[in-house]
From Swiss-Prot:
Subunit structure as annotated in this protein's UniProt entry: Part of the 30S ribosomal subunit. Forms a tight heterodimer with protein bS6.
Alphabetical UniProt keywords: Ribonucleoprotein, Ribosomal protein, RNA-binding, rRNA-binding
Similarity section: Belongs to the bacterial ribosomal protein bS18 family.
Name of the protein in its database record: Small ribosomal subunit protein bS18
Entry's Gene Ontology molecular function annotations: small ribosomal subunit rRNA binding; structural constituent of ribosome
Gene Ontology process terms (BP): translation
GO CC terms of this entry: cytosolic small ribosomal subunit
SUPFAM superfamilies hit by this protein: Ribosomal protein S18
Organism: Desulfitobacterium hafniense (strain Y51)
Pfam families xrefs: Ribosomal_S18
Free-text function comment from the UniProt entry: Binds as a heterodimer with protein bS6 to the central domain of the 16S rRNA, where it helps stabilize the platform of the 30S subunit.
InterPro entries: Ribosomal_bS18, Ribosomal_bS18_CS, Ribosomal_bS18_sf
Keyword Phosphoprotein tagged: no
Top-level lineage group: Bacteria
Amino acid sequence: MKRERGRRPRKRVCSFCVDKVESIDYKDTHKIRKYITERGKILPRRISGNCAKHQRQVTVAIKRARHIALLPYIVE
């Protein structure tokens, strides 16, 4: 029995590293919304393609924006 080998998905490149972004601003909700699902959850690193440093910054920015009501906690 021969096993089928699927193609490995391409490694996504961190968009913040490409643009050489120093820090992610929590007030820039337009940029942050790309990293939230339609249910309001934060996208994981393996899906968003961010590096560890920028994924932490995105997470903190999303949580800050939620706290001051720029972003919703739950999208209905």
